[in-house]
């Protein structure tokens, strides 16, 4: 078990030097934009190591980790079973470019956990998974248009970047240069949680919509759960109009329950995308679904998809070890820890007198500085995001590493213990007071 993190955060000098060095060879100094701290200001922390619930940065500062590598680390960092599995796999060879028994076992685990999934294809990232699922939906239906929801992020796929969440929301970008007008023209962007808008889009585009893609529960505009009946309504509308429903469970899959969001709600998609937890923190992802749809993939069908490193044996080993270790006790701990975190957040922010909403999507958590619940991207953007930088940095100074963006979900691990929650509880009052005292003009953003 990790030792209680030290509240010794006087220096970020080593991280600052590394950031300057990185900026000379890596665009923006980071390999994914949100890591650059652009929306919160300050120096991004360069991590040297992690164990259990603890991150240690290049300056030796320790933090309770509430990012968990953006979701995958449900067991905590460097879990012995996962580390041992990776070590054994690596000694047997790093990559073969050929099938292995382990990749069959991982696919069997996924199929066994998520009932609507008959077949699975492994890929290397969530972006690949969503890109491939959309291509497959278009190939299966013979249609071109897709529906997505504002604030939902499905990776940096050209057709899915319009009004996306995650880093796109963090940086305030409507889309991205390089996405052509033709690609954008086939993407219909609608408000999340608005079934009337979806019904109207189908009526306005008869026989043209291949699929609706949605985060099964949104986590990339913050934690925003689907309103009761929303996913079921999507299921009904897609069936009525001959379109496919793609449930993006890259974030929720095998985190919010052993069967992902499907295990909580029971609404079946035609296609699913997975990542994060199923890879144990290594680069791997998957897409899967009904056999009649998945069998349109090459070599059985005409829809092409491939990958040199797909099914990488080391990543597969990490994923298998994680799923095997993720028993009922782990999921109970995740739910319990999320509820406890939410309670501490509510207590501190209420005491500080700042308007806020602590929201959950399963065991994913978010804080919105708002006087009303956040149900879609518009209400997320309408919150007082200028309070978040002060809140974030006070937590960081207190030894708590939260997501460096107001538009990202917070993630707990099963490794959090009494020491971890004591550190969180100690850091929160000052952070809440900092948020309450913040002004739009004084924001670091």
From Swiss-Prot:
Listed InterPro entries: 4pyrrol_synth_GluAld_NH2Trfase (IPR004639), Aminotrans_3 (IPR005814), Aminotrans_3_PPA_site (IPR049704), PyrdxlP-dep_Trfase (IPR015424), PyrdxlP-dep_Trfase_major (IPR015421), PyrdxlP-dep_Trfase_small (IPR015422)
Similarity comment: Belongs to the class-III pyridoxal-phosphate-dependent aminotransferase family. HemL subfamily.
- N6-(pyridoxal phosphate)lysine occurs at 276
Q: Which UniProt keywords apply?
A: Cytoplasm, Isomerase, Porphyrin biosynthesis, Pyridoxal phosphate
Question: Which cofactors does it use?
Answer: pyridoxal 5'-phosphate
Q: Where in the cell is it found?
A: Cytoplasm
Q: Provide GO CC annotations from the record.
A: cytoplasm
Extract the CDD domains matched here: OAT_like (cd00610)
GO BP field: protoporphyrinogen IX biosynthetic process
A GO molecular-function descriptor: glutamate-1-semialdehyde 2,1-aminomutase activity
Q: Does the keyword DNA-binding apply?
A: no
Provide the assembly information.
Homodimer.
Listed under catalytic activity are: (S)-4-amino-5-oxopentanoate = 5-aminolevulinate
Q: What PANTHER family does the record tag this protein with?
A: GLUTAMATE-1-SEMIALDEHYDE 2,1-AMINOMUTASE, GLUTAMATE-1-SEMIALDEHYDE 2,1-AMINOMUTASE 1, CHLOROPLASTIC-RELATED
Q: Where does the source fall among the domains of life?
A: Bacteria
The name under which this protein is listed is Glutamate-1-semialdehyde 2,1-aminomutase
Q: State a single Pfam family of this protein.
A: Aminotran_3
This entry's Enzyme Commission designation comes to: 5.4.3.8
């Amino acid at each position: 078990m990790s030792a209680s993190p030290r509240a010794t955060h006087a220096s970020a000098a080593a991280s600052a030097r590394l950031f300057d060095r990185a900026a000379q060879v890596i665009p923006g100094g980071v390999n994914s934009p949100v890591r650059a701290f652009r929306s919160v200001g300050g120096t991004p922390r360069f991590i040297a190591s992690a164990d259990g619930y603890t991150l240690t940065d290049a300056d030796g500062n320790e933090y309770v980790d509430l990012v968990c590598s953006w979701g995958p680390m449900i067991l905590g960092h460097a879990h012995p079973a996962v580390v041992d599995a990776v070590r054994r796999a690596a000694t047997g060879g790093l990559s073969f470019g050929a099938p292995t028994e382990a990749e069959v076992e991982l696919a069997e685990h996924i199929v066994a956990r998520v009932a609507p999934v008959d077949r699975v294809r492994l890929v290397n990232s969530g972006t690949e998974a969503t890109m491939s699922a959309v291509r497959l939906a278009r190939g299966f239906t013979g249609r071109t248009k897709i529906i997505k929801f504002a604030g939902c992020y499905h990776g940096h796929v050209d057709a899915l970047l319009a009004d996306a969440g995650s880093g796109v929301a963090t940086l305030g970008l409507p889309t991205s240069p390089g996405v052509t007008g033709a690609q954008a023209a086939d993407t219909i962007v609608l408000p999340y949680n608005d079934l009337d808008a979806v019904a109207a889009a189908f009526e306005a585009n008869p026989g043209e919509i291949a699929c609706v893609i949605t985060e099964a529960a949104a986590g990339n505009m913050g934690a925003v759960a689907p309103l009761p009946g929303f996913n079921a309504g999507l299921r009904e509308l897609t069936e009525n109009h001959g379109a496919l429903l793609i449930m993006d469970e890259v974030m929720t899959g095998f985190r919010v329950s052993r069967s992902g969001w499907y295990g909580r709600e029971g609404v079946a998609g035609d296609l699913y995308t997975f990542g994060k937890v199923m890879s144990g923190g290594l680069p791997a992802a998957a897409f899967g679904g009904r056999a009649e749809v998945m069998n349109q993939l090459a070599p059985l069908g005409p829809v092409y998809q491939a990958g040199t490193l797909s099914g990488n044996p080391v990543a597969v080993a990490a994923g298998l070890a994680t799923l095997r270790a993720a028993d009922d006790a782990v999921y109970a701990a995740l739910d319990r820890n999320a509820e406890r975190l939410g309670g501490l957040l509510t207590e501190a922010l209420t005491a500080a007198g700042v308007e806020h909403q602590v929201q959950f999507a399963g065991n994913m958590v978010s804080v919105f500085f708002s006087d009303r619940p956040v149900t879609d991207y518009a209400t997320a953007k309408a919150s007082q995001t200028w309070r978040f930088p002060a809140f974030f940095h006070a937590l960081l100074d207190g030894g708590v590493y939260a997501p460096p963006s107001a538009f990202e979900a917070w993630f707990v691990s099963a490794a959090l213990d009494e020491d971890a929650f004591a550190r969180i509880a100690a850091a929160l009052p000052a952070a809440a007071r900092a948020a309450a005292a913040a002004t739009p003009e004084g924001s670091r953003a």
